Design a protein with these regions (language model features):
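Amphipathic, oligomerization/interface secondary-structure segments
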Residues: 1-160
Length: 160
């Protein structure tokens, strides 16, 4: 996916300054900054907290926020469930190990190579970017409007 044109437009939009625009721009800036973090464990945590931040202005656990993100970036219930399972698995198997058990990502069984780690980090970056673009193009300017639109999307997907 070539995100460059959409990302550029979001980063440098001179006509919007609302709370949704700011969180979208903030998320893209964090994705860009993540490339400069030399440690993969810290990169993962940085990106994961970005996912949490774009889902809601208040802290929510993964069970609550994952549906908020997923509903904007999938087209059907099958993909909704698939992405939801992926996020739940990564939260349990990776985030918990890094954040609560103090492990390094490269010490986890599935991430013993840089290729495996980079693949996972890229997946997370793409989820963030897909969400940001989907939200930005709605033109929605407040979290209240965003929640209402999200509920409509979830109804269409049959996942509420």
């Amino acid at each position: 996916n070539d995100y460059s044109k959409d990302c550029y437009q979001i980063l440098y939009d001179r006509y919007r300054n609302d709370e949704i625009y700011k969180i979208c721009r903030y998320a893209l800036q964090r994705v860009a900054k993540s490339y400069y973090i030399p440690d993969s464990t810290n990169t993962f945590i940085f990106l994961w907290t970005t996912l949490e931040a774009i889902a809601s202005p208040e802290y929510e656990n993964v069970k609550k926020w994952k549906g908020k993100v997923i509903s904007f970036i999938v087209q059907d219930q099958t993909n909704y469930n698939k992405l939801g399972e992926y996020i739940k698995k990564i939260s349990k198997d990776v985030r918990t190990e890094l954040v609560h058990n103090g492990k390094l990502i490269q010490d986890l069984d599935d991430y013993s190579t840089m290729l495996a780690i980079d693949k996972e980090l890229t997946k997370i970056k793409n989820i963030i970017i897909d969400y940001v673009i989907a939200v930005y193009i709605t033109g929605i300017k407040s979290f209240t409007e965003l929640d209402n639109h999200r509920k409509e999307l979830q109804n269409k997907l049959g996942v509420n």
